[in-house]
Design a protein with these regions (language model features):
Chain A
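Polytopic transmembrane helical bundles with strong interfacial aromatic enrichment
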Residues: 1-157
Length: 157, 502
């Protein structure tokens, strides 16, 4: 269970990194497309078409943010109930709350663009929290994994 | 390796703690999973269902007088609601729908055609004529149904799969008969799997001329549509050139067939002659203003070819324009105005033909967005009066009623609201009363945080959709219905005909 918990926490952190990457990828594609004379407005946005490839960044961001990350955070929270480590539930809950807040702030950005800035800031908080949540768990296997290479390196050939 | 140290305490206490350690996580998990599973299960739709069984009845403050059931005893079927069955047709139109690859702006795009083209043929008739459209579906796999957007046709002819008819499968036919009872600019489009089918071009223009014709010398219908990201007018990428002599007056009938609002502006002053097929009363000249044309809406713009040999541009968004003037006459792209024409105060007041103050029904249509499950899918979904699909309101009226609807967009995105079978007149926006020409709409742009008070006369019995014309939103459940007491539909959503109106 600890392994699952640790992996899930790291996946949340990795997902935050992916979210940041695909969004900037999409914006870069948009800027390049507009630079080439393209018009991006509500009709194009809602047409379901992909006028430039990087639109997939927005689609991935939306699917990840709405479904995938909340689902992983929820499974992490449930896993934490069975992880007999002090603070595991607390940190899973912090991650979960930050994920929920991140989604709400993101949608709020549709109305108040400044919320988008907070969305970016909260992403850093979420990344840090998720990364720490994974890192603070010492699994039964990890000491072995950490020690073995050292032993091997120290052994003269 | 984990070493458990023996804690002090009695054996009973330790066993109790162990039990708790096992039970508490399970209980916490159950507390999270069970409500989610229940919500998921409750949102799943049966294999076939009637819109009459969906959601809850809203009598608009009027006493509930037809029992608790949506289905009243001895209800009339909407299939009876047809146009003058004994009258021969004045105009016969044959339409064949196909699923094929479209060539748009040098690109190949999977889409749909009507009589071999997209958009389909422009149907142009005179007011008062009885139109008979013979539809044959040749190859559209999901089936088709044609909706006459903006014309208040009899309910059985409204073309909504699963509500007023079954989707027409490949090889089958359906005949639409209706009287073009009002002059104006309209359009037709599929209302079966409407989001992909409309996006794929299963649509066309429908123009009804007044018996005496129109005053303008140039009359052009311009359907703006985006095919796979390519902006077009009447199916051609780029600008539409219309040859005309200097000094000619023109009426450009613009239809926005996309899912989002579009701005329209011109290179010289213009008048907005009509909105959604209804003439504006005493429209004045406009300059430095753009007209916001919401999804599904139409605007008739009147302007004049300049006398100096140049052309006039009518911009349909920044991307495309109708250019009218002598052959090869040029005109620079006019800058997009920062302000939009406010229809709340445009034109001059006139009588409405009914008294909104005497409304017997008052409905709320409050749009929100919240997390939940729709059709078994988790997500952030549009809500109507706080409810998610299918727990949407069924607004109930009786023939002859005057109804008021308070439409309020509490979400953060624009919604083009479309009521079938009726025209709504705008009474107020954000509480500010309308002072201009009667502003009649069938497709209303309700921006984020805006509210509208509209009124309509219940003069067209049946069961009607009242939905967002961002068809993606409709497919995600942003659909309510309006029903007249004493009517029922034999059609079902899904079921053997696989009716999927959105």
């Amino acid at each position: 269970m600890r392994n699952a918990y640790k992996v899930l926490a790291y996946i949340v952190a990795a997902e935050v990194a992916i979210q940041a990457m695909v969004m900037v990828w999409a914006i870069a594609g948009l800027v390049k497309w507009v630079d080439g004379g393209g018009v991006f407005d509500k009709s194009i946005m809602e047409s379901g078409a992909t006028p430039f490839t990087e639109v997939f960044g927005i689609i991935v961001h939306a699917i990840n943010g709405t479904f995938v990350v909340p689902a992983i955070a929820l499974v992490l929270l449930i896993t934490s109930f069975f992880t007999k480590v002090r603070g595991a539930i607390k940190w899973a809950a912090i991650v979960f709350v930050l994920v929920v807040a991140q989604g709400q702030i993101g949608y709020l950005g549709h109305e108040f663009p400044f919320a988008g800035a907070l969305h970016g800031l909260n992403a850093l908080a979420l990344f840090s929290a998720a990364f720490y949540t994974g890192r603070r768990i010492r699994t039964a296997a990890s000491p072995v994994v950490e020690e073995q290479p050292e032993v091997q390196a120290a052994t003269p050939v | 390796m984990v070493i458990h140290s023996q804690r002090p305490g009695s054996g009973v206490e330790t066993r109790g703690r162990r039990m708790l350690r096992v039970v508490l996580p399970v209980l916490a998990t159950v507390a999270i999973v069970v409500p989610l599973a229940w919500m998921w299960q409750a949102s799943r739709m049966p294999a076939a269902y009637s819109v009459m069984e969906m959601g809850y009845l809203d009598y608009g403050g009027h006493g509930q007088d037809s029992g608790h059931s949506h289905h009243s005893e001895a209800a009339r079927s909407v299939t009876e609601l047809v146009a003058e069955p004994a009258r021969p047709a004045d105009v016969r139109v044959d339409l064949v729908t196909r699923q094929e690859i479209l060539k748009i702006g040098g690109r190949s795009i999977a889409g749909f055609t009507v009589n071999g083209t997209s958009p389909g043929p422009e149907i142009r008739v005179r007011q008062g004529q009885l139109i008979e459209v013979h539809l044959r579906n040749e190859s559209v796999a999901a089936g088709v149904a044609l909706h006459w957007h903006g014309l208040d046709v009899p309910n059985a002819m409204d073309g909504v799969a699963g509500v007023t008819q079954d989707a027409v499968p490949i090889g089958a036919r359906f005949t639409y008969r209706f009287v073009a009872d009002r002059a104006g600019s309209f359009w037709y489009h599929s209302h079966q799997v409407s989001n992909p089918q409309v996006a794929g071009g299963l649509l066309g223009s429908l123009v009804v001329l007044p018996p005496s014709g129109i005053a303008e010398q140039v009359d052009v219908a311009a359907l703006a549509h985006t095919y796979g990201g390519v902006r077009t007018i009447n199916g051609k990428a780029g600008d539409l050139r219309v040859p005309a002599e200097p000094g000619r007056r023109m009426r450009i009938r613009i239809t926005n067939t996309d899912n989002g609002p579009m701005q329209v502006w011109t290179s010289r002053s213009f008048r907005l002659l009509a909105v959604d097929g209804t003439e504006v009363n005493r429209p004045t000249q406009v300059s430095d203003r753009a007209v916001t044309l919401t999804a599904g809406a139409r605007a008739d713009i009147e302007t004049q070819v300049p006398a100096d040999g140049t052309a006039v541009r009518v911009q349909l968004s920044k991307a495309t324009a109708v250019i009218v003037g002598p052959q090869s006459a040029e005109v620079p792209v006019p800058p997009q105005p920062g302000d939009e024409l406010d229809l709340l105060s445009y034109g001059s007041p006139a009588t409405l033909g009914f008294e909104p103050a005497q409304a017997g029904r008052r409905f709320d249509y409050l749009i929100g967005r919240r997390p939940g499950f729709v059709k078994g899918r988790p997500g952030m979904w549009w809500s109507i009066n706080g409810h998610l699909y299918p727990n949407v309101p069924m607004f109930v009226v009786r023939e002859g009623d005057v109804a008021l609807v308070h439409i309020e967009n509490r979400s953060s995105e624009v919604h083009p609201m479309h009521l079938h079978g009726h025209h709504m007149v705008v009474l107020a926006r954000n509480g500010v009363a309308a002072t201009g020409s009667p502003w009649w709409v069938d497709s209303l742009n309700v921006a984020a945080k805006e509210s509208y008070d509209v009124a309509f006369v219940a003069d067209n019995p049946g069961i009607w959709m009242d939905h967002c014309h961002n068809l993606k939103h409709a497919a995600d459940g942003m659909v309510a219905h309006l029903m007249y007491e004493g009517f029922d539909t034999p059609y079902r959503i899904a079921g053997p005909a696989d009716n999927r109106p959105e």
